[in-house]
C-alpha cells in the first residue's frame, strides 16, 4: 500500500495531494482546493508571485482606452525586466541555473517568475531576504516552489502554438527572452567561470614571481561592467 501511494503521489490519481500544485507550484483553487498543497521546506526553485506586469495586458490611456504596445517595444520591456531580475538574483543570492516567467492570465500564474538556483541554500536565502523587499513599488511575495522540472510544468500545446485555452490555461505558458539576451546572460556565466579560473592562474603565477598585483586588471573590468549595468538599471522603471 505504501509503495502504491508513493507511486501515485502528485499525480491525478492522488486523491489527497494536489497534482497541479505538485507540478506547477500553483493551483487556481488556492486555499480553497480540496487537496493538499504540500509546500516544500527545501528546494532549488523559488517563485516570485505576480511580479511581472505585461504592458500589453495593463496599458490604458487616461480615458480608459487600451494603448497599443508594439511587439518590438514589448520585447524590449520584457528583456529589460528579465535581465534586471536575473542579474539581481545572481549577484545577491547565488548562481541561477534557470529562470522562467509565466505569460498566463489566470490569477494564480499571471506574472509569476520562477528562479532555479544551483544550490538549495541560495534559494532559501533568497526567499528570506526577498520577502522583506519591494519591486516596482510593490512588496515581493517569494516562496520555495516544488517545481524543478519545467518540462512537466509547461503547456506542450502552447509550445507548438496549439493551446486552445489561451492565457487561462492551468499549465505554464513561458514567455521567451530574445536570443541575444539569452546568449548574454547564460554565456556571461560561462565567461565568469573561465575568468575566475584564469584569475586564479594569474594570482598563482604572481605569487611565484613575488608580485601581488596580477589579478587586479580583471577586477577593474568587472567593476566597470557592473557600473555600466547599474547605470542602465537606474533608467528602468522596475527597480528593486
Swiss-Prot record:
<keyword id="KW-0694">RNA-binding</keyword>
<dbReference type="InterPro" id="IPR000504">
    <property type="entry name" value="RRM_dom"/>
</dbReference>
<dbReference type="GO" id="GO:0005654">
    <property type="term" value="C:nucleoplasm"/>
</dbReference>
<keyword id="KW-0507">mRNA processing</keyword>
<dbReference type="GO" id="GO:0006397">
    <property type="term" value="P:mRNA processing"/>
</dbReference>
<feature type="zinc finger region" description="C3H1-type 2">
    <location>
        <begin position="149"/>
        <end position="176"/>
    </location>
</feature>
<keyword id="KW-0488">Methylation</keyword>
<dbReference type="GO" id="GO:0089701">
    <property type="term" value="C:U2AF complex"/>
</dbReference>
<comment type="subunit">
    <text>Identified in the spliceosome C complex. Heterodimer with U2AF2. Interacts (via RS domain) with PHF5A (via N-terminus). Interacts with ZRANB2. Interacts with SDE2. Interacts with SF3B1.</text>
</comment>
<dbReference type="GO" id="GO:0071013">
    <property type="term" value="C:catalytic step 2 spliceosome"/>
</dbReference>
<dbReference type="InterPro" id="IPR003954">
    <property type="entry name" value="RRM_dom_euk"/>
</dbReference>
<feature type="modified residue" description="Phosphoserine">
    <location>
        <position position="61"/>
    </location>
</feature>
<feature type="domain" description="RRM">
    <location>
        <begin position="65"/>
        <end position="147"/>
    </location>
</feature>
<feature type="compositionally biased region" description="Basic residues">
    <location>
        <begin position="188"/>
        <end position="208"/>
    </location>
</feature>
<dbReference type="InterPro" id="IPR035979">
    <property type="entry name" value="RBD_domain_sf"/>
</dbReference>
<feature type="compositionally biased region" description="Gly residues">
    <location>
        <begin position="212"/>
        <end position="222"/>
    </location>
</feature>
<dbReference type="GO" id="GO:0015030">
    <property type="term" value="C:Cajal body"/>
</dbReference>
<dbReference type="GO" id="GO:0008380">
    <property type="term" value="P:RNA splicing"/>
</dbReference>
<feature type="region of interest" description="Disordered">
    <location>
        <begin position="183"/>
        <end position="240"/>
    </location>
</feature>
<protein>
    <recommendedName>
        <fullName>Splicing factor U2AF 35 kDa subunit</fullName>
    </recommendedName>
</protein>
<dbReference type="GO" id="GO:0008270">
    <property type="term" value="F:zinc ion binding"/>
</dbReference>
<feature type="modified residue" description="N6-methyllysine">
    <location>
        <position position="39"/>
    </location>
</feature>
<dbReference type="GO" id="GO:0005681">
    <property type="term" value="C:spliceosomal complex"/>
</dbReference>
<dbReference type="GO" id="GO:0016607">
    <property type="term" value="C:nuclear speck"/>
</dbReference>
<keyword id="KW-0539">Nucleus</keyword>
<keyword id="KW-0862">Zinc</keyword>
<dbReference type="GO" id="GO:0030628">
    <property type="term" value="F:pre-mRNA 3'-splice site binding"/>
</dbReference>
<dbReference type="InterPro" id="IPR012677">
    <property type="entry name" value="Nucleotide-bd_a/b_plait_sf"/>
</dbReference>
<feature type="zinc finger region" description="C3H1-type 1">
    <location>
        <begin position="12"/>
        <end position="40"/>
    </location>
</feature>
<keyword id="KW-0007">Acetylation</keyword>
<dbReference type="Pfam" id="PF00076">
    <property type="entry name" value="RRM_1"/>
</dbReference>
<dbReference type="InterPro" id="IPR009145">
    <property type="entry name" value="U2AF_small"/>
</dbReference>
<keyword id="KW-0747">Spliceosome</keyword>
<keyword id="KW-0863">Zinc-finger</keyword>
<dbReference type="GO" id="GO:0050733">
    <property type="term" value="F:RS domain binding"/>
</dbReference>
<feature type="compositionally biased region" description="Basic and acidic residues">
    <location>
        <begin position="223"/>
        <end position="240"/>
    </location>
</feature>
<keyword id="KW-0508">mRNA splicing</keyword>
<comment type="similarity">
    <text>Belongs to the splicing factor SR family.</text>
</comment>
<dbReference type="InterPro" id="IPR000571">
    <property type="entry name" value="Znf_CCCH"/>
</dbReference>
<keyword id="KW-0597">Phosphoprotein</keyword>
<dbReference type="GO" id="GO:0003723">
    <property type="term" value="F:RNA binding"/>
</dbReference>
<keyword id="KW-0225">Disease variant</keyword>
Amino acid at each position: 500500500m505504501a509503495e502504491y501511494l508513493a507511486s501515485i503521489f502528485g499525480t491525478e490519481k492522488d486523491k489527497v495531494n494536489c497534482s497541479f500544485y505538485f507540478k506547477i507550484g500553483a493551483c487556481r483553487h488556492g486555499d480553497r482546493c480540496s487537496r493538499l498543497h504540500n509546500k516544500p521546506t527545501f528546494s532549488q526553485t523559488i517563485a516570485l508571485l505576480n511580479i511581472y506586469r505585461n504592458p500589453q495586458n495593463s496599458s490604458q490611456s487616461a480615458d480608459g482606452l487600451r494603448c497599443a504596445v508594439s511587439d518590438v517595444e514589448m520585447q524590449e520591456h520584457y528583456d529589460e525586466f528579465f535581465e534586471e531580475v536575473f542579474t539581481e538574483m545572481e549577484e545577491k543570492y547565488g548562481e541561477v541555473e534557470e529562470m522562467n516567467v509565466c505569460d498566463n492570465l489566470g490569477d494564480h500564474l499571471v506574472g509569476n517568475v520562477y528562479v532555479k538556483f544551483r544550490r538549495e541554500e541560495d534559494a532559501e536565502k533568497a526567499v528570506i531576504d526577498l520577502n522583506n523587499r519591494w519591486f516596482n513599488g510593490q512588496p515581493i511575495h517569494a516562496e520555495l516552489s516544488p517545481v524543478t522540472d519545467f518540462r512537466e510544468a509547461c503547456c506542450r500545446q502552447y509550445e507548438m502554438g496549439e493551446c486552445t485555452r489561451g492565457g487561462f490555461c492551468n499549465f505554464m505558458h513561458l514567455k521567451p527572452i530574445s536570443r541575444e539576451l539569452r546568449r548574454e546572460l547564460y554565456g556571461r556565466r560561462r565567461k565568469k567561470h573561465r575568468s575566475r579560473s584564469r584569475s586564479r592562474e594569474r594570482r598563482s603565477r604572481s605569487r611565484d614571481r613575488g608580485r601581488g598585483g596580477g589579478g587586479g586588471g580583471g577586477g577593474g573590468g568587472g567593476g566597470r561592467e557592473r557600473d555600466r549595468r547599474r547605470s542602465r538599471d537606474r533608467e528602468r522603471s522596475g527597480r528593486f
